[in-house]
Amino acid sequence: MPTRFKKTRHQRGSTFCGYGRVGKHRKHPSGRGNAGGEHHHRINFRKYHPGYFGKCGMNHYHKKKNTTWKPTINLDNLTKLMAKDEAMKAKKGEVLPVIDLLANGYSKLLGNGHLQAPCIVKARWVSKLADKKIRKAGGAVVLQA
């Protein structure tokens, strides 16, 4: 049967509006937020949030990530990192190509072999012999952190 007013309009002035005496139907009967996730809300947490509770593994605070990482490359392999046209320009003495070893996945430059064309090398570590050979060929070394 259609009624003129909604239930809330009918209950205006009745003090409790269908929810019993003072204190009933109020506050947080099942706890706030994630309360009871391992108790009375267990089904919900197990179904929709598996793995929410409990620990897994160990925490290593202030871990230094791989301090021994030092992939090396020799002088004779440096030209492989250069484009062919860059090597030709360097031999003519036009523009020196810049080789960034860190961007290519290397951190240390070793002095085995000979440098075919002068270039500017950016590296984290460079051996004394490699530095000497690069400068002799007319290039330069830039150390990076």
From Swiss-Prot:
GO molecular function: RNA binding; structural constituent of ribosome
Ribonucleoprotein in keyword set: yes
Stretch list, region Disordered: 20-39
Biological processes, Gene Ontology terms: translation
InterPro entries: Ribosomal_uL15, Ribosomal_uL15/eL18, Ribosomal_uL15/eL18_sf
GO cellular component terms, A-Z: cytoplasm; cytosolic large ribosomal subunit; nucleolus
Pfam families with a match to the protein in the record: Ribosomal_L27A
SUPFAM superfamilies: Ribosomal proteins L15p and L18e
Domain of life: Eukaryota
Keywords: Ribonucleoprotein, Ribosomal protein
Family (UniProt): Belongs to the universal ribosomal protein uL15 family.
Name listed for the protein in its UniProt record: Large ribosomal subunit protein uL15
Species per Swiss-Prot/TrEMBL record: Trypanosoma brucei brucei
Gene designation: RPL27A
